[in-house]
Swiss-Prot record:
Keywords: Hydrolase. It is an enzyme of class 3 (hydrolase). Belongs to the AB hydrolase superfamily. Hydrolase RutD family. Disulfide bonds: none annotated. This is Putative carbamate hydrolase RutD. Involved in pyrimidine catabolism. May facilitate the hydrolysis of carbamate, a reaction that can also occur spontaneously. GO terms for molecular function: hydrolase activity, acting on carbon-nitrogen (but not peptide) bonds, in linear amides. The keyword Hydrolase applies. One of its GO terms (biological process) is uracil catabolic process. It holds the Pfam family Abhydrolase_1. InterPro entries: AB_hydrolase_1 (IPR000073), AB_hydrolase_fold (IPR029058), AB_hydrolase_sf (IPR050266), Pyrimidine_utilisation_RutD (IPR019913).
């Protein structure tokens, strides 16, 4: 699997791995790259079956496979100790890494993640799946911004949304791959395992997230033994895109706090 690895800003710089959500593309994190690369060696990637890592995913694709593929790719380029910043599905992959490769994961930032799928989030995905089956990629892509962005933000950026839609259609991951990744996401449940996650976790969520209610982060924090959280007042599901200055400050402060906190013995 191809990775994009930035040069370290100084010798011994910590490594931060960025994991996108269901869309899978590493470009999702573009608003964060400049700020992060001043202090960290940053790894971005397109998840298997998306972007520049095209593949046909197996029918019973799992979250554990997603995490394993990333861990293997990082090891292959000599990265054996790192922090993860994950958004939604990316946060779930980070949680899976915390279980499966605890010696490798120094710290985790979960953005709009969850412990187990909330009934509201399930409803949103059911609606989106119906749109996909009825109207194909076009319908999925056209509806996507409604779940990602606040209404006022979208209303002020119609040309940008049109350009994003065209790009998303041109690079659509394919119906089968999308549904297999989505099924893996829906099956994820950390409620029985969160208590044994040893790495420190910082949670960021947005109070106006339409897709993943902010209570999901509260539930996740309550289940994780070494965690703290912050709630953005606005920004929607893609709060790192719509409110990058606020988000980047919270992210950098959160990472600094995690890396300077006492890591529990593994």
């Amino acid at each position: 699997m191809k990775l994009s690895v930035s040069p370290p800003p100084f010798d011994g710089a910590p490594v931060v791995v960025l994991i996108a959500g269901l869309g899978g593309g590493g470009s999702y994190w573009l608003p964060q790259l400049a700020a992060l690369e001043q202090e960290y060696q940053v790894v971005c990637y397109d998840q298997r079956g998306t972007g520049n890592n095209p593949d046909t995913l197996p029918e019973e694709y799992t979250l554990a496979q997603m995490a394993g593929e990333l861990a293997q790719a990082l090891t292959a380029v000599g990265i054996t100790r790192y922090c993860v910043v994950g958004h939604a599905l990316g946060a779930l992959i980070g949680l899976q890494l915390a279980l499966d490769t605890p010696d490798a994961l120094k710290a985790l930032v979960c953005v709009n993640g969850w412990l187990t799928l909330n009934a509201h989030t399930r409803r949103c995905f059911q609606i989106r799946e119906r749109l996909l089956h009825a109207g194909g990629a076009q319908a999925w892509v056209e509806a996507q911004p409604l779940f990602l962005y606040p209404a006022d933000w979208m209303a002020a950026r119609a040309p940008r949304l049109e350009a994003e839609e065209a790009l998303a259609l041109a690079h659509f991951q394919g119906k089968n791959n999308l549904l297999r990744r989505l099924n893996a996401l829906k099956k994820a449940d950390f409620s029985r395992h969160a208590a044994r996650m040893a790495c420190p976790v910082h949670l960021i969520c947005s109070a106006d997230d339409l897709l993943v209610p902010s209570v999901c982060s509260s539930e996740l924090q309550a289940a994780l033994p070494h965690s703290h959280s912050v709630v953005m007042r606005q920004g929607g599901h893609a709060c790192n895109v719509t409110e990058p200055e606020t988000f980047n400050t919270l992210l950098l402060n959160g990472l600094a706090s995690l890396l300077h906190s006492h890591e529990p013995a593994l």
